């Protein structure tokens, strides 16, 4: 049962052109598994699942090398093409769902602190089905990145999309939480907007975000804006309400203008324009 230390953990890592960090990430995450197994908190056959999202570099070759060197602890999934971070992460979670009891998703750049995975597992053992990794501060981000990220969460909030502030996709999910998530038929995936809808007991762990160990950020402004659009269009009726409201106001103003023009015409005060043509 839960808390017995027999639960099998799968650490799901979406990868897109991560050849510079993959070996470092694998070593760090294997260290986490070894530590948790040694402490009796997870099953001995717990593993890391790297999801190759159509990388153009040597990412997949390195995943294969890691699997050959560590066949129990490292596995890989190769997607047919580049489907994007959210779909790659979803593919990894659904693959891991049948192979594990609990999952932790984390990006390959290791900016999220792997040390708090133990705290996530402890909260899982205490009954939580979803544990969010939340950044305390964004000191390592550039001013531009920090400002756009804060703007992202503010827009989400204004549009009525429920998200956990300063949480990206570093989270623990129990098997039943992943099963519940897999039932959603969303085409515009925005996982951090979907998680609060699942229900079940949730909690947070807090950590300081680090700088990338190597390589470049895979979330430039363009992708961030696309993610925001997906979140708003998938989880908020506010844009529809706003468009509907604007439409109603325009119709009312048009009717009032037509009535005014007609009255002016009938009383002889011709408004220059179309009423003089009647």
Protein language model regions, located:
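Acceptor/aglycone-binding surface of glycosyltransferases and processive sugar-polymer synthases
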Residues: 79-81, 85-95, 102, 114-191, ...
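Conserved amphipathic alpha-helical interaction elements at protein-protein interfaces in regulatory
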Residues: 31, 35, 65, 69, ...
